[in-house]
Design a protein with these regions (language model features):
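Conserved AMP-binding A3 loop
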Residues: 45-72
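Adenylate-forming
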Residues: 91, 132-168
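Short beta-strand->loop structural element characteristic of the AMP-binding/adenylate-forming
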Residues: 1, 14-18, 58-61, 89, ...
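ANL superfamily adenylate-forming
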Residues: 3-41
Length: 168
C-alpha cells in the first residue's frame, strides 16, 4: 500500500502491511487444507503490563479470547474500520494501549503507523503526513499534545476518532 511504501522509504521504519495480514486471515478461514495447531480460545496469547496507576505495574495474561473480545469491543466504539483506515499506535508496546490497538488494526485490515517511543511533535507530523484516522492515547499523552504551541501548525483534519485510557 502506498502509505506503507512511503513510510518505509522516508523513515527507515519496518512496515507491516496489515491489509496483506487481513487478506491472509480471510483466506485461512476458507482454506480446508490448512492444519491449525490445537489451541483453545482460553489459552494464553500474550502477556502485557498494567499502567501501575494503583501501585507497581503487574503482568496480565491475555487469552486468545481476550484478544477477540477486545477487538469486538473496540470495533463497536470505532466508526472507521477496515481498509482505508489509518491507525496511529503511540502507546507503550508492553501495555494494552500499544498491543491492543495493533491487534485491532490487524484484525480490521487497517493500516497501522507505529511509533517506537512517545514523541508528541512526531505524533502531530505523522497525523498530518499519513492522514491518521484513528488514535488511542493515554490521558497524559493527550494532555501533553494539547498543550503544545505547535499543535496549530499541523493539519489534523483526517483524525476522526480518538480513544483514551490507561490512567485516571
Amino acid at each position: 500500500n502506498q502509505i506503507g511504501e512511503e513510510i518505509a522509504a522516508t523513515n527507515n521504519f519496518p512496515v507491516i502491511n496489515t491489509q496483506q495480514c487481513y487478506d491472509k486471515i480471510q483466506q485461512l478461514t476458507t482454506d480446508t487444507a490448512l492444519v491449525l495447531p490445537a489451541i483453545t480460545l482460553a489459552e494464553q496469547a500474550l502477556i502485557i503490563y498494567t499502567s501501575g496507576t494503583t501501585g507497581n505495574p503487574k503482568g496480565v495474561m491475555l487469552s486468545h479470547n481476550n484478544l477477540f473480545e477486545m477487538y469486538y469491543a473496540l470495533r463497536s466504539e470505532t466508526p472507521l474500520l477496515g481498509p482505508g483506515a489509518v491507525n496511529l499506535i503511540a502507546g507503550p508496546w508492553y501495555a494494552v494501549v500499544g498491543v491492543g490497538y495493533f491487534v485491532f488494526g490487524i484484525f480490521s485490515g487497517c493500516t497501522n503507523v507505529l511509533l517506537k517511543i512517545f514523541d508528541p511533535i512526531e505524533i502531530l507530523r505523522l497525523i498530518q503526513t499519513y492522514k491518521i484516522t484513528n488514535a488511542f492515547f493515554a490521558p497524559i499523552m493527550m494532555k501533553i499534545i494539547c498543550a503544545l504551541d505547535e499543535v496549530h501548525e499541523y493539519d489534523l483534519s483526517s483524525l476522526q476518532n480518538i480513544q483514551y485510557g490507561g490512567s485516571p
